[in-house]
Amino acid sequence: MTEYTLYYATNRKHNGSDRWHPKGYGNKFSDDGMENLRFGQLTLEADEKKIAKLLAKKLRGNGCGDGEKLAEYLTGCAKTARIDAYEEVLRADISDKAQPDAKLGSQAMFADLKACMEQRGDVLVFIHGFNTSWPDAVGSALALQLALNAAEQADPNRHVRVVLFTWPSDGLALPFVSYKSDRSEAAGSGYAVGRGFLKVRDFLADLHDRAGGAKPCGQNIHLLCHSMGSYLLQFALRRLDAFTPGSALPRLFGHVFLCAADVNDNALEPGQPLARVHEIADNVSIYHNRSDMAMVVSDYTKGNPERLGRAGAARPLLLHHKVHQIDCTPIVKGIVEHSYYLGGRGIIKKKKSIDGLAQDDSARKR
């Protein structure tokens, strides 16, 4: 068995009496409030040969790499993972800004990630969607990390680190009850994500101030929102705007990926909740699939307008020039066809092939 490590941030309530070494995280908000964030890393044991076999599995019409089966396998492994939250020492009754001697978990994790990036590795923040338990979230995030590093264009000397943000979605397959509950919890969790973005902004600003003219490491932080994760992003942008002076949001990410986005298909138009997402990134990619049954269910059984993740933007000409769309319908296979961001290296390859390229670069493959 081989050990695998994953970084995480969460506003879930921990399971067990030891908050720094919990048994896991549940489907309720932290007792310290929905915007309270715990940062940490977990280590799980898994069969390296089984992982390699799943990553090498050939898929019909979509290259190789069965990410969904890999996520299922790692979900089982996650139930016995060792969890180490970064310890904190600070008062809850006043702002951490007023506590110069406070010990913050976010600062400790950011420092560790900075060390990873200095070894020529990018970081990808992953926000999951609806109906996802703690083990499910860990399995998906770690599968994504392994798939990215196994992709054809992956540099063996550059290791992508996925940072999971997991929020208390129900993890219950009760379509009407769970979806409505998760939608409410996603809104509150979006503000927690925004708080996390503010912490990243402040950390990067502090690094810049202390750099003394030294060149940055040259690596990027990216963001991938799956399904209802894009709904969280709407509220994260609102919180970021509320605490950002000036007229522009801070540019935090190299690339933002909106995969199977469970938001309205006009969400990126001027005046809509995601209209300013281009301000926080160099590029924004919308991945959609016309055969995504989860999007159909969201449209018709939940009474939602047409979803962005099904047919893409309603009026493409109204999108900012940094936003582009990828129709995954021809290469996605399966019954539900919703978690295709994990489904084969064909899609993973597409993500890596456009990373860092300008919108008009001829190397971009549509």
Where are these regions (language model features)?
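Gly/Ala-rich beta-loop-alpha elbow adjacent to hydrolase catalytic centers
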Residues: 193, 225, 229, 233
